[in-house]
Regions:
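Bacterial Sec-dependent N-terminal signal peptides
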Residues: 1-19
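Early exported N-terminus immediately downstream of N-terminal targeting peptides
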Residues: 15-64
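A structural motif
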Residues: 15-18, 29-32, 85-102, 107-109, ...
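Mature extracytoplasmic domains of secretory-pathway proteins
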Residues: 54-108
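Solvent-exposed coil/turn segments that connect beta secondary-structure elements
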Residues: 61, 115-118, 134
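Short, hydrophobic/aromatic-rich beta-strand segments within well-structured domains
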Residues: 98, 109-115, 127-129
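Short, low-complexity Ser/Thr-rich regulatory SLiMs
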Residues: 101-103, 114-119
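C-terminal partner/receptor-binding element of secreted or periplasmic proteins
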Residues: 121-148
């Protein structure tokens, strides 16, 4: 019974966000994604209570579609501190976007997007992360993660 309740709570974590469709396999099929879910004491030092990520490889247009979903969510949910960065190191390219996307009860919610590719290929390795916790801001979260 407890597992069923935990599963229901996890399923609702991104409710109301466009990116929820990605996590539920409606944009990229589940079998093409590597998913990680963490809840509990292992996240306490980061002041987080829930972490969920998906990683997958897609073409440029699909990667751009997922980034737009993350950006749209950042606009529609009391977003603060959105940060975007595009980096080129020789033939390696990456796009990063991080934002706070409102609250779930008494927890702040955060979204991160990263796409990486080499050279002129249209294939992108994409990671999207959703996090919840008592951490107050994106800046504080970055500080906690960087001090590990």
């Amino acid at each position: 019974m407890m597992t069923l309740l935990q599963s229901a709570a996890l399923a609702e974590a991104q409710t109301g966000l466009k990116i929820n469709d990605l996590f539920e396999g409606r944009i990229i099929p589940q079998e093409r994604m590597i998913e990680t879910r963490v809840r509990g004491k292992t996240l306490a030092k980061y002041q987080l209570s829930y972490y969920r990520s998906v990683r997958f490889t897609v073409g440029e247009s699909e990667a751009d579609r997922v980034l737009k979903m993350v950006e749209d969510d950042s606009k529609g949910h009391f977003a603060t501190g959105g940060k975007s960065r595009k980096t080129v190191f020789g033939k390696e390219h990456s796009v990063n976007f991080k934002t706070q996307v409102g609250r779930q009860g008494d927890r702040n919610c955060f979204l991160c997007y990263q796409a990486w590719w080499r050279g002129n290929t249209s294939e992108r390795e994409v990671t999207v992360i959703y996090m919840e916790g008592s951490v107050k801001s994106l800046e504080q979260l970055e500080e906690l993660l960087n001090n590990d």
